[in-house]
Amino acid sequence: MIEQLNRKDPVLAGRKVLIVDDDVRNIFALTSALEAYSMNVVYAENGRKGIDLLRATPGIEAVLMDIMMPEMDGYEAMTAIRDMEEFKKLPIIALTAKAMKADRDNCLAVGASDYISKPLDIDQLVSLLRVWLYRQDESR
């Protein structure tokens, strides 16, 4: 049978996620994968635009943040987001091609909730989103 087009997952369905990545191919692939779980996706092409979109778009419940981007990288963007009171507990998952332990530690040190290295395993990413969104629901 054809793989489920719309995967029903009550933790993910209808949730709004912000993708911040400068590579349109990554944005397209992530958007396609997350929309299959009935998630709502908005995106920005660098950290500065991501922060602007986060401020201007109500209801964003998680951020997927690339690290290496022009204008404002993911480290700077996560630091700025964590400096805003209303986003201190917003789940931010860092997405990076750098896979060394120090890279993970650097991401967590500036405010990432979690970290996943590229190339992304979509099942692992969905699992992380499920965990962080569930935790967010439980803390309300």
Which role fits each region the language model picked out?
Residues 22, 43-52, 74:
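Helix N-cap/capping motif at the beta->alpha junctions
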